[in-house]
Amino acid sequence: MFRNSVLLAFGLSISFSGFALAALEEPVPGQQVQAVEGARKINPAAVEVLLDNNRRMTLDFYGDNIFRIFRDDKGGIIRDPKAEPEARILADNPRKPVSRLDVDQKGDAVVITTGKVRIEINKKTSLFKVINLKDHSVVAEQASPILFEKGKTSFSLKAKPDEYFYGGGVQNGRFSHRGKVISIENQNSWTDGGVASPTPFYWSTGGYGVMWHTFKKGQYDFGSREENLVNLSHDENYLDVFFMVNDGPVSLLRDFYQLTGAPVLLPKFAFYQGHLNAYNRDYWKEDEKGILFEDGKRYKESQKDNGGIKESLNGELNNYQFSGRAVVDRYKAHDMPLGWLLPNDGYGAGYGQTDTLDGNIANLKSLADYARKNGVEIGLWTQSDLHPKPEISALLQRDIVKEVRDAGVRVLKTDVAWVGAGYSFGLNGITDVAQIMTYYGDNSRPFIISLDGWAGTQRYAGIWSGDQTGGVWEYIRFHIPTYIGSGLSGQPNICSDMDGIFGGKNPLVNVRDFQWKTFTPMELNMDGWGANEKYPHAFGEPYTSINRWYLKLKSELLPYAYSIAEESVSGLPMIRAMFLEYPNPYTLGKATQYQFLYGPYFLVAPIYQETRADEEGNDVRHGIYLPEGQWIDYFTGDLYEGGKIYNDVDAPLWKLPVFVKNGAIIPMANPSNNVSEINPNLRIYELYPHGSTSFTVYDDDGVTEEYRAGKGVRTLVESRVDDKNNVTVTVHPAVGDFNGFQKKKATEFRINVTQKPSGVSAKIGENSVNLAEANSMEDFKSRENVYFYDRAPNLNRFATKGSDFEKKVISGNPQLLVKLGAADITAAPTVLSVEGFRFEPAEKHRLSSGALTAPANAAVTEENAAAYTLKPTWDAVPNADFYEIEFGGMLYTTIKGTEFLFEDLEAETPYSFKVRAVNKDGHSAWTAVSAKTKANPLEFAIPGIEGETSVENQGSSLAKLFDFKEKDA
C-alpha cells in the first residue's frame, strides 16, 4: 500500500501514472500565478528559481530525497523561523550529502534532478510535480499556486482516491486524517477533538511527507471540503516548507528525524510507574470524609493553614505519613512498582521550608537520597523559571543546575504555566533542561515529560496529553487513537495520567486504564486533584490485586519494551497503528482505532466502554481485527485464525484482551518494583514457536547518554520449527558493550506448548548441557540446568495475601520451562532443541453439532437505523454456536447474539450485509440484508457561523456551538 515518498513544501498531489511535462493543470482563476523566467544552481545543494516580477524561490536540498522550498516575496532570504524565545526546529546536523543536482529546461518545464527525485516546474504556472526516480511515479503534484495573504500562506496538493494521511502531532481522538481537517495549533485542549501537542508535519501513503518550517499555527485539510485536494496553510507571511520523498512510513519518519532529531530513548526507570503530588505546602486535618491513612484516621487536605499538620518532603516534623518519603514506603508496603517520584507541583509548593535556596536544595537532596536508596528517582514539576531570580522568595526559587548537580534530580515535568504558550516557548525550555541534565547530571539521560510540543520536541522530551477527568470511559476511549497518532507524527514517547488527574471513584475504569497502559511507555499517577487518591491500591480489592498484576507484568516485559523503544528512535513507534505492519483498506482508515500493536508481537484491544458488563465489571469486547496469520490469547492460550474481526471476546475484569502473534519471541525479566530489583545475571525468553522467526534484543546502561555513541548490546534470537515438529531456538552471541554490562548470565526459556515434548536438549557453543528434569516448580527454581513441564501455569501470582482474589484460579496454557546455568553470553551461541513440539489449543468457539439453517427474518428495522449506524437483527438458529456477518469485504465472526451494531457509517447511504450461522460442523447458507442510513441531522445546518460573547467564555470556546461536532453539543 505504501508508495515511495517525498516530503514537499508545495501543494502536490500524489499520482503514480506516467505524465507529460506539460500536463500540469492550469491554476484556478484568481490565484497568484507566477511565470518562471529561469533557474540556476547557486551552490552544490541549492537551486534558485527566478519568477516574474523579480521574485525568487529557493529549493534547498538536505539530501537526495529531501528538499526545502523557501519563498519570501518581500525579499527575505532563506532563514530560520522567528522564535521568541529562541528555539530551533531543525537538529544540529540535518543535512546529508546530495549526490547530484542538475538543472535543465525541457519544453515548458524547468527540471531539477538529484539522485533520487525529479522536480518539474511548469514555466507558465510555476506549478510543481515531484517524481520518485525509484519507480518514476509522481508522488506529489501542486494543484494551485502559492497564495500569500495578510498573515497567511497556503497552497494545495492533489490527492489520490486511495491515499491516506497521518501526522499533525497529538490530535486527540484521531490518527487517520483522510477526509478530515486538523489544526496545527496549540489549543491546550485535553479532550476529544482538541490538539494537545501539534506538529507541523504529515505524511502520505502516496510516498511523501511535508514539514512546514514555522512556529506559527496552521491548518491541514485532507479533503474535508474538496475530496481530491489537500489544502495546507500557516499563519506566516512567507513560505518555508520541507518535502520528503521516500518508501513507506519508517523511511518517512526517519526523514523527519533527520531534519528535527531522533526521539529520546527513555531511561529504564521511566518505564515504571511514576507518582506526582506536592508534599511541601498543604495542611492535613482529621475529617471523617477524608483520605484514610496508615494511622487508621481520615484526613482532608487544605492549601491554607486549617490547624492541621503541615506536610514536608522528609517527614521530619512528626508528619511522616504526609511526606514524600511516605510515598516511597507506601508503594513498597503495598508491593507496587514505582520508578520515580515528583514531590512538588510547581504551584507554590516548592521543595523546602528553610529561608534559603541552598537549604531547600539540601532538603530535596535528602529526599532524593532516600528515594534512590529504595530504587526510585526524583524529579520536579516546573511551572516557573528554571534559574534563580532574586525577587522571588526562597520557597519558590528554582535553580535547575543545583537541583540536578547537587540534589540529583533526574526527571522534569513541564506544565501549562511554563510552556503553555507552546511553539518556540516550549521547545526553548526543554532544550535548556535537557542540556543541563546531561552536563551537570553525570551524563544522565534526560527524562522530560512535556506538553504543548512542536516539531523537535521529540529529541528532548516525551509528551503528556494534558489535564483530564478520570472515572469515565471516554478518558480511555479517545486516548487509544491519540497515542497511535502521536507515534505516526514522530513522537513515540506519549503518556497520560492513570485514570485522569481529576475525577475518579470508578474502580472499573481505573483497572481498565492500568491494564491497557501496561503496553505503553509511561504511567503517571497524578495525585492530589482527583475525587480519590491516585494510587494503584486506592480502591481496595480486587482492584489492588489486578493493578499490581499488570504493573508487575509491565516490569517483566521491560526487555521487550526497551528493545522496541530503541527501535522507535529510528524506526517504527512502540505503539503501532495496525496498518504499519498490516496495511490494507480496513486498517488504513479509522476502523482499527481502538486497538494497536505493541511492537511486532503484541496486539492490544483495550476495554474502552461497557458493552455487556455485569456489576463486577466482567465484560466482552467487540470489533477486534486480527490480521492474517495465527494469534494467541496471551492469558488463556486460545488460538485464533487471523483475517477476521472477532466479537464477544471474553474480558472478565482481570483480563485485558491481548493477543500474541504466533512465532513471537518475547525477552523478559524477573518481576520487579524498580530497576534496582532487576536481576542482571538472568535473561528470559518466552517463545511461541511457529515457522521461522527472529527478534533482536537491545540493552544498554539505561541511564546515560552513552547509547548515542553506540554503547549498547544486541542479541539476535531465532526460532525455527521444522516439518517434524522439532523446535530449535538459537540465542546468538551478544554483540557490543556498555558500562556495567554483565557478560555472565543464566538463560531461561519459556516455550508455550499444549503437551509435554518428547525431548529437550541444549548446547552452549560446542558443549552440550546436561539437563535434568525438575519434579516441581520449587525444584525448578532452586536448581540450574533443569527443565520442567508446567501443565497449568498460575497467572494469579501477585494477588494481595489473604484477599479473595488470591483464591481465584487463573491458569494459562502449558509451558516447557528450561533454565541454563550462567555462561559468557558474548562467547558462543546458546541453542535449545525441543523434540515433539505441539501447540494445538482446543477449539473454544465451535462446540455444537447439527444441521444449520440460514438465519430467518434478517433485517434492519426502522428503529435500528440511524444516520451513522445500522443494527441488523435475525432469528436464533438451532445448533448455532455463533454467527458471522460479511460486510465491506470483511468477515465479522464469533457474534454470540442475534443482533450487531455497525457504527461510523455515512448518512443516506445504502449498505448490504450477509449473515450466517456457524458450529463445528460448518456453517449455514448466507441470508442477505440491505438497509440505508438516515439523513444527516446537521444536513441543513449553516456552515461558517461565528459568534462572540460580551463576557469571557467559561470552560469551552463559543466556537464549539458552531463547529458541527456533536460531542461539543
Regions found by a protein language model. Name each.
Residues 21-268, 307-310, 314, 321-323, ...:
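N-terminal accessory segment at the very beginning of proteins
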Residues 24-29, 136-656, 661:
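Catalytic-domain carbohydrate-binding cleft regions of carbohydrate-active enzymes
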Residues 561, 891-897:
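Short beta-strand segments within Ig-like beta-sandwich modules, predominantly Fibronectin type-III
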Residues 676-695, 937-964:
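Predominantly extracellular/luminal regions of secreted and cell-surface proteins
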Residues 846-878, 907, 925-938:
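Pro/Thr/Ser/Gly-rich low-complexity, intrinsically disordered linker/stalk tracts
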Residues 883-885:
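Short beta-strand elements bearing conserved aromatic residues within extracellular beta-rich modules
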Residues 900-903:
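Hydrophobic core positions of the immunoglobulin-like beta-sandwich fold
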Residues 905-921:
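Beta-strand-rich modules
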